Amino acid sequence: MPVITINGPIGCGAVTIGQMVAEQLQLNFVDRLFFTEAARIVGTPVGTLIAKEQRVDRFRDRLGRFVQTMLERSAMSGVSGEPYFGRGIENLPPETYMDLTGEGGGVAQKLDDKTFIEAMNKVAHDLHAQGDAVIIGRGANHILANAAHTLHVGLLAPMEVRVKTLMDREHFEEEEAHIHVEELERAREDFLLKFWKAHPSEASHYHMMLNMGKMNTKTAAEVIAHAAGDLTS
């Protein structure tokens, strides 16, 4: 019953790699789980949390159109999906955590920290109890730091690689992609520092770290799948 967490900044390919690993090992693929279920537990619409993506303001309108498109696609493809593993939810854009660290001004900022973290912990531990999952989510490796049969993987990549990934995937101009990468990473760092007093690139929080500037996604997925074999052998 292995559980694999994959964490990394936007543009490292965590979602793609996670999907590959899940397919290879026949595991459930879990992406926007924490915000989806945490929002349900605390009674906040998940759309409200996702919408804060638009608060990366310098190109808000373009991101707003992107968010709307992804939400429509998710609704179409995930209409009959399960709350944890619904198809289509993995296509939603990455969360910024800006409201949760006080950078934004929306509903998420008003959530009590203790309530939010308790919800995050419950969801993560429920998933771990079920087993057989690849979890894409910032903070999952901290919540399940000492959990049995769990492999924590960190991803990193040079700025130019991450910027190019966004340009190719989201059709951003280079300047837009660069701003997006920088602001989301800063928000991610602030979030982890606030709630876990940790930096996302600290190697001690993972079983392994992979430099996506040095390998492709297929190789990374194969390395992770091989390492996960130790959890079941």
Question: What spans do the regions from the language model cover?
Answer:
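ATP-dependent small-molecule kinase phosphotransfer cores
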Residues: A39-D132
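Small-molecule kinase domains that catalyze NTP-dependent phosphoryl transfer to phosphate-bearing small molecules
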Residues: D57, D61-R65, V79, E173-T217
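Conserved phosphate-donor/acceptor-positioning beta-strand/loop module used by diverse small-molecule
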Residues: N146-E170, E174-E182
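Glycine-rich phosphate-binding P-loop
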Residues: T5-Q19
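Pre-Walker A (Motif I) flank of P-loop NTPase domains
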Residues: M1-I4, G131
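Short beta-strand-centered segment that lines the nucleotide-binding/catalytic pocket of NTP-utilizing
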Residues: N28-R40
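Short, amphipathic alpha-helical "lid/cap" segments that border enzyme active or binding sites
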Residues: N121, T217-A225
